[in-house]
């Protein structure tokens, strides 16, 4: 909020853009990135929002019904469309390189970071400001996901977002933004940047199966995971930890478990698997970015958080979903995101060593 007010933008941006601009400012400051010392055309932005601004749409639709089409605000479209998060981050910080808005539902944040990674790999940018943002806790947002039976109906908050538990019955919607500064390694080293971890692999696939359900056999998500490992030059047996999509819905947690077993075989039983959504809820298009940051910090601190609320699993959910937290070295972390429409994305991180 202070960041936005200092720029005079608090009343212009809708919430998903406010979150993104504020988070980007924090990331740029933390990275010690000084735009005056960079070629602005080599610093880009890849910030996605899965839905855009429902608030703007709801407000102007009410105005349409009450006062007619002539009273609809002229800024409805620019305030509503999902690419405004990336656009406003670029404007706020003078980023003149490639600017992307990836929209792949709940895989948006992960794809956004992955596409930023590819942009740097291809030499199209030295630095990318990347992540996701979302603000869909509105009447139509809650009603829509409730009608889809995706939200938890538990009256006990402690049992409302419990990924992989046999009593899971849906997710709790969250909102916010997570943004990171991705940088070509030699460029980061030359300017003495603080390096938290390395992003070394990115894998994607499409289920081509159903508009809301992941593929039942897990083949799509398994392919994305294996593609990320292959891209990073890591054998499946070298991985010890996965940050799962883990939405606390019946189908996702079951089918993602099948995907992990399909990708890793017997090694799946040696993996530690957790869900950050057990603590912060499901941030939709920002979820993958939040979970990416979680993995970065877990690698840095040598800590794997527990899956909160997990008490008892069902027969087929027989992997280690981290009922307890672990204090141990995390050499690699794989984070998964699965989006409506069958979009699958995985990112592989590794511990940075000089």
Model region roles, listed by residue range:
Residues 1-13:
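Single conserved hydrophobic/aromatic residue that forms the stacking wall/gate
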Residues 52-56, 135-161, 203-223, 247-262, ...:
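Active-site-adjacent elements of ketosynthase-type condensing enzymes
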Residues 14-17, 40, 74-83, 100-108, ...:
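Active-site nucleophile and cofactor-binding loops and adjacent substrate-binding regions
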Residues 27-39, 188-195, 225-241, 263-267:
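Phosphate/pyrophosphate-binding loops at sites that engage ATP/ADP/AMP, CoA/4′-phosphopantetheine
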Residues 20-33, 82-85, 90-134, 172-193, ...:
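Active-site-proximal alpha-helical scaffold in enzymes
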Residues 20-31, 85, 112, 183-185, ...:
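Short, well-ordered amphipathic alpha-helical segments that serve as non-catalytic structural scaffolds
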Residues 156-232, 241, 354:
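Condensing-enzyme catalytic core mediating Claisen C-C bond formation in acyl metabolism
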Residues 49-100, 142, 146-150, 252-266:
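Active-site-proximal gating segment of KS-fold condensing enzymes and close homologs
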């Amino acid at each position: 909020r202070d960041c936005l007010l200092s720029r005079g933008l608090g009343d212009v941006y809708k919430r998903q853009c406010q979150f993104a601009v504020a988070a980007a400012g924090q990331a740029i400051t933390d990275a010690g990135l000084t735009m005056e010392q960079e070629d602005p055309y080599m610093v880009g932005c890849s910030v996605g929002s899965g839905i855009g601004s429902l608030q703007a749409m709801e407000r102007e639709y009410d105005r349409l019904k009450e006062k007619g089409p002539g009273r609809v605000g002229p800024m409805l479209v620019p305030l509503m469309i999902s690419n405004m998060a990336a656009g406003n981050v670029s404007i706020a910080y003078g980023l003149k390189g490639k600017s992307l808005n990836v929209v792949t539902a709940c895989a948006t944040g992960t794809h956004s970071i992955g596409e930023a990674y590819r942009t740097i790999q291809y030499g199209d940018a030295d630095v990318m400001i990347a992540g996701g943002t979302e603000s869909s806790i509105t009447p139509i947002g809650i009603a829509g996901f409730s009608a889809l039976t995706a939200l938890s109906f538990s009256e006990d908050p402690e049992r409302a977002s419990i990924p992989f538990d046999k009593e899971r019955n849906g997710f709790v919607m969250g909102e916010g933004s997570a943004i990171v500064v991705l940088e070509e390694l030699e460029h980061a080293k030359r300017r003495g940047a603080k390096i938290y971890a390395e992003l070394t692999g990115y894998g994607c696939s499409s289920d081509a199966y159903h508009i809301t359900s992941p593929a039942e056999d897990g083949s799509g998500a398994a392919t994305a995971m294996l593609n990320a490992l292959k891209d990073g030059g890591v054998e499946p047996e070298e991985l010890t930890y996965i940050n799962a999509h883990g939405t606390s819905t019946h189908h996702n947690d079951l089918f993602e478990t099948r995907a992990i077993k399909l990708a890793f075989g017997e090694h799946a039983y040696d993996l530690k698997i957790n869900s950050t959504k057990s603590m912060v809820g499901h941030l939709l298009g920002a979820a993958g970015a939040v979970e990416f940051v979680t993995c970065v910090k877990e690698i840095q601190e040598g800590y794997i958080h527990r899956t909160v609320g997990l008490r008892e699993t069902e027969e087929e959910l027989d992997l280690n979903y981290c009922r307890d937290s672990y204090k141990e070295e995390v050499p690699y972390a794989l984070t998964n995101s699965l989006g409506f429409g069958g979009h699958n994305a995985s990112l592989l991180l590794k511990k940075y060593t000089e």
